[in-house]
Amino acid sequence: MSDRDLFAGLLAPRSFPGWVELLLPRIEARFQEGRHGDWPAWMQLLGELPKVVPTRLDFAQNAVRIEGDTDCDGATRRSIETALRRLHPWRKGPYDIHGIFIDAEWRSDLKWRRLEGAIAPLAGRRVLDVGCGNGYHAWRMLGAGAKSVIGIDPTLLSVVQFLAVRHFAGDWPVAVLPLGIEDFPAETRAFDTVFSMGVLYHRRSPFDHLVELKGCLRPGGELVLETLVVEGEAGRVLVPEGRYAQMRNVWFVPSPPTLSSWLTRAGFRQARLIDVSPTTTQEQRSTGWMRFQSLADFLDPEDPSRTIEGHPAPRRAIFLAEAP
């Protein structure tokens, strides 16, 4: 299957009317800039995954669960696990695929638990998830009743992990595409809810990012924004001169009052804080499915309230806001 056919199939008109014409040229332009060197091997891996008919699917529990009654004996299960482990590292999860538990670096279900009761109900809504990783939250959005979910993330391995999960889940109105927000059409005003989680602090211009998100929302649509914050009054912003928790590309970490004012200045209405939580080593950690260093390695061993660079340890805030 060609790359074009692969992504055109994800954007099937019955689920995403009009989006093939808008997004496919942008995906093709992205691939013209160069593919990841492992892309052919990943496509071969996807093509060789066993075909197991799902009989039970649950996108509303902590682990996105896909099960089947037949066609998944021990040998098949071992084959599936071997293939999925070749897609290491798994950053977001957990997943339970035919009894194979993918214990990803992030307990992404904990973040979902913090926001699910506060956001506008997703039933019947068209959703965009910016910086979606491998699509764990996109499946949870579908489980919460979303009509359709488009996730975008420029990391090709994350897209391949989504495609592997989708292979076993079947055809659902959810797609993860290899695009960044800067590649997405401006001012579509097409979505009822837009999520941006773990993206804002990676942007050199946070205001540009907020304006891009606003342009994706219909009037009255809801933004769900999750990002790193520091404690402090309005006006306080941490601008790391070097790394932050070993991340090179952290540009701005505002206080919650500062972020609220940014949302208002960017044109959003009714900005409100719904949660602030420290990131713990129970939520982000190394596992058998993500064997590299993780949060525990990035904190000061003598004072875990600081990063190894001396900055305040990660705290994350969730804001809701309404598009005008």
Swiss-Prot record:
Keywords: Transferase, tRNA processing
Gene3D superfamilies: Vaccinia Virus protein VP39
Enzyme class: transferase
GO molecular function, one term: transferase activity, transferring alkyl or aryl (other than methyl) groups
Subunit structure: Homotetramer.
Residues at which carboxy-S-adenosyl-L-methionine binds: K92, W106, K111, G131, D153, P154, T155, I181, E182, M197, Y201, R316
Entry function: Catalyzes carboxymethyl transfer from carboxy-S-adenosyl-L-methionine (Cx-SAM) to 5-hydroxyuridine (ho5U) to form 5-carboxymethoxyuridine (cmo5U) at position 34 in tRNAs.
Catalytic activity: carboxy-S-adenosyl-L-methionine + 5-hydroxyuridine(34) in tRNA = 5-carboxymethoxyuridine(34) in tRNA + S-adenosyl-L-homocysteine + H(+)
SUPFAM superfamilies: S-adenosyl-L-methionine-dependent methyltransferases
HAMAP family membership: tRNA_carboxymethyltr_CmoB
Biological processes per GO annotation: tRNA wobble uridine modification
Name of the protein described by the UniProt record: tRNA U34 carboxymethyltransferase
Family listed: Belongs to the class I-like SAM-binding methyltransferase superfamily. CmoB family.
Enzyme Commission number, as recorded: 2.5.1.-
